[in-house]
Amino acid sequence: MAAFTPRAVEQTQPTIERVVARLLDEVAELDEFDLVSQVAQRIPSEVMCEMLAFPLERREWAAERVLGMSRTLDPDITPAEVDALAVGLAEVEEYMLPVVRERRANPGDDLMSGLTQAMVDGELLTDTEIIANIILLFLAGQSTTRSLISNAVVELFRHPDQMELLRSDPTLDRAAAEEFLRFVGTIQMLSKRALGPVTIDDVKFEEGDQAMIVLASANRD
């Protein structure tokens, strides 16, 4: 899909840098601020809105509804919460459908326009498929980006010598990012629930039993 080739992704760097610079400028003169809510949490959604050329007046509205979809991955979500999320999703789809059709008729340089022209097995994506992909893009980098930025800053303050090293040599940024991913990985654990009786390494699980898989332990051996 041309919208997601390495070259297309690389071209998003100026957009990301512009969004990050703007968010940092907003908090630079404040005596104190919340790094998570005012910077880290906003970066992925703001970047995605920029890439999609989403109207400014609808960005916060769309982000609130789409990001709520991440709750569907929670094994403890209630039926009432599912119903509420379904209403929000329907509102987003209703709003985005004419926007997608307009971009298909008059494509620009934004990601949404790219999706309207993308071919899979020789066929264009349907409007429904485009909206589903946009929602997936909003969700995919949210919690991971927010958590990695927040955890990385915490670790830098815990290790001021490493902070000073990174400040003195910005070329270490890529290596630092890789180390943060290892040391404070954004997905620490996964919850799984047995759909039926099963035995794994002599451990018996009955239907409904829940297990926590601690992925972070692999990076701390």
Task: Describe the role of every protein-language-model region.
Residues M1-D221:
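Cytochrome P450
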